[in-house]
Amino acid sequence: MKKQVLDTLRNSLLIAAVASVSATYSVAQTSNDYNKRELLWQVLDQSRANDYVPVFFNIHFKDKTGQKAVQSHIDWYKTTHVDFVNVKYEYFPEIQAVSSKKDWKNIKSFAPETWEEQLNVIRQLKHELGHEALIIPTVFSPLRVLIQTAGAQLSSDRDGRRRIVEIIKQDPKAIKPALEAVTKSLVYYIREARKAGADGFYISSQGDDLEEFGGGVFVDVLKPYDRQLSDVAAEVAPFNILHICESGGHFTTKTFDDYLDYPGSIINPPLHNWEGKGLSLADISKLFRRPVLGGLNNRSQALKEGNLTALKAEVDEILKDAPANFIFGADDSVFNDVNQELLRKLVDYIHTWRQTHKK
């Protein structure tokens, strides 16, 4: 408890320091006056709007480990001009193929060396880019990782995933020991990644959003493990994003109620897959009382077609009503084959939008 109080105090002092710096200078927030680390910190200072709009888009990189993975992240950051480095790691070894609910008890925690290749990627990215940009690894939910380690390692393996989901639905409480083991491993990774140079984490919550596991199953079975990752990230790191992943599910306005008590500096919600009337970015910022990351549909037809004019029109509509403290992004990862040169032009347009569109 004492450590959590100290961590909270530390984070408050960091944000206060940013606010002090912001107040000292009368110049606009631009990448000429501050580096991208400072510009992102300024989003957390809710005493003033951020007139520089940071941007975050990400993809699923083909190369997962080694120097190729490091270079893929560097190339994406430098080519697209996004404002922080999101480190993705999506491969988890199969621990135990699950064919019945009796098999859940055989799921054990990962060996520490499982994470070493990923930690090396973080160390190298910190060395190459840490002086100018925040290093923010993605941490996937215990549920997602459990499904992968139980036999559906690839997200494209829909049949495998469906089979495991059906086993879970037979007796959701039976997966608790397996969730405990996986969560323990993910907590270990968060702590080690922080030591390796991570400035914070992109925590991907995945439970209440899945139609198979909404309501009581999420609250009673999944949430205690799901939230634990956000709690640990908040304990060890000052800049964390809570990504509420829709994963093909359908949200209602009540869906967010289960996430209001999660820690996290910034909220990255789904906005384009609602049942009934949805919430706006401003609504969500007010609901969570935090800055929001998002706005663009990651399945945007204009993005798929590479239509910059249409994309700028979408940006205009989003930013004119966006909350004061805001990072522009998408609901989730964009197309892997997105035109990166086009994306850079869009990112540059967004960065200065509030300065070029002043009322």
Walk through the language-model features, giving the residues of each:
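Bacterial N-terminal signal peptides that target proteins for export
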Residues: 2-13
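Active-site loop segments of alpha/beta catalytic cores
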Residues: 30-60, 83, 87, 114-359
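Bacterial N-terminal signal peptides
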Residues: 11-22
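Boundary at the C-terminal end of the N-terminal hydrophobic targeting segment
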Residues: 26-28
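N-terminal capping/small domains of soluble enzymes
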Residues: 48-107, 115
